[in-house]
Amino acid sequence: MTSSPLAGQHVLVTRPAGQAEGFRTLLEAAGATVTTAPTIRLVPPSDPGVLGRAAARLDEYDWIVVTSVNAVRRLAAAAAEADSMCALATGRLAAVGPATADALRALGVADCLVPPAYRGEALAAEIVAATGAERLSDARILLVQAERARPVLRERLVGAGAGVDVAPAYAVEVNRDVRGALREFIELGLGDWLTFTASSAARAFVQLVGAQTGGALVAAISPVTAATLSGFGLPVHVVAATHSMPGLVDALVASAARPGRLAATHDHA
């Protein structure tokens, strides 16, 4: 295989500003031309005090569950302010995926639970299995996530009998500053791929320019994000088998190696 398997491919990245660089680097290393258009921006949650109060009593929780790198950053800041970094580092941690786990380990967390599939349903199942169904009714769990995140993780844990406190770490809003550039990119048919690494970015994309692709193919990081896109009427051509940014790049590379399979749908005319 060529060392630049995505050469000649123009890829749109919709991740938030300040968080797209790693994904961009991976894509460019594979030979792609990359345009970034952050469809969302991260802002403080409606009540920042919830996370601060939870961070002050981390040692009271049997599990601290974190669902994104962004949530790790904000939890760490709150824990530092509450002088509870030791409780964070020595607590029983669970992360939705390897990037989140790596961010926790960078804070000194010795180990944390990561599910084999990087989604809330799988994480809930792993926590239940690791705790034991008979002991879960006595467990207190702190769930650190985005405001208005998918409720499935909390619902599964509560349904299994756990007591769950949700601490919103940040909120997501549509980044309207990119509407003009994004519309031009789509209307001129400049892209070969539109990539989405979160359902929130997919929803914002549709709010900004509607359910149109400009002839580009659509790639999603996970079945959850793919379902969000499909729900808006956007065709999804690729879903990463491993729900991570490297996994999404791998999926694009694999598709580039089979151009005939997607040629019928990839038409800029």
Spans of model-derived segments:
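Signature of uroporphyrinogen-III synthase
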Residues: 1-269
